[in-house]
Amino acid sequence: MTLYHISIKKIIKHYTFSILVTSLLLSSAAFSGCSLKNATGTTDTKSQEPISATAIKLNTAVTVTIYDSQNRELLTECMNLCDKYEKIFSRTASDSELYKLNHRGLTPVSGTKDTFQVSDSLAELIKKGLSYSELSEGAFDIAIEPLTSLWDFTAENPQVPEDKLIQEALSKCDYRNVSVNDNNEVTLKTDDTAIELGAIAKGYIADRLKDYLVSQNVKSAIINLGGNVLCIGGKPDDSSFKIGIQKPFADRSETIAVMDIKDKSVVSSGVYERCFEQDGTLYHHLLNPKTGYPYDNGLIAVTIISDQSVDGDALSTTCFSLGLENGMKLAESLDDVQAFFVTSDYEIHYTKDFQKEITVTETD
């Protein structure tokens, strides 16, 4: 078995970004002797090598690997879809739909000053974000954009903001100031309300890529959006993909666990994804919308296995925000969701049925 690490490391002084989930895949030699069905449904004994494409999209490394087709146009369309959705969900691109909504650059609905018509995709994702904000009672808050912008973990030299500025930003963060109706009309109830979808957008986009590939008869593929891994089926021989979870703060080649995954999403959130150190203290990007500072609850990572990647994306952040006990309770209350939590002592805590449903090997 050959180990392929789908990873990127970007260091801008104190800022480190890393992809958490690596894929352990069989080498091409392991496919010899088997015939594969390509995306047109015909058998192709020569096309046994997977096809893959990687590009920097959505401010991260996007990799799509297809195992049962040689049609590279499928890969091109996946990258085009990433571009399409980035123009909808980006918080920072001035031509994106979300940016225009946050900066009141859209025309208000007739007779209103704070309600705006948005696209189906943006309305759908805002609704999803609001549902998790409500489920977590604000521990996950899609109206956290003023606080996210203030901390700006993507800056060349990120710094801890002044407390008075943090408190000012906090006063603007409340998901209850956002509503969306069935006509795709979004209401921002205060002038300072702004939406941040970074915690769920990649999951949503991964699901849309899967929808597209499945519509093209692809039955074996891995979609990796910066560590949001979504498996379509399993390997061409019908065995499971092996997905490795990176050990927090370790070398990119070091995993803490390896799981057998088929037709599921695997998403992780951790304190080491985007962080910087100041005066001997590590500050990470998972901000508490109640205090304005990074969460400090004894967790360093949460991994969610789910059917839909958007749910895994939202839940990995939500469960982290809730802490080990309450995050575990939430994960165990949901159908078709499994999770494991890594505490600061590197102990792994599984939801009750995790190891019954998913084969996992701890590697540390």
Q: Which ranges hold each PLM region?
A:
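Mature catalytic core of soluble alpha/beta enzymes
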Residues: 2-19, 23-364
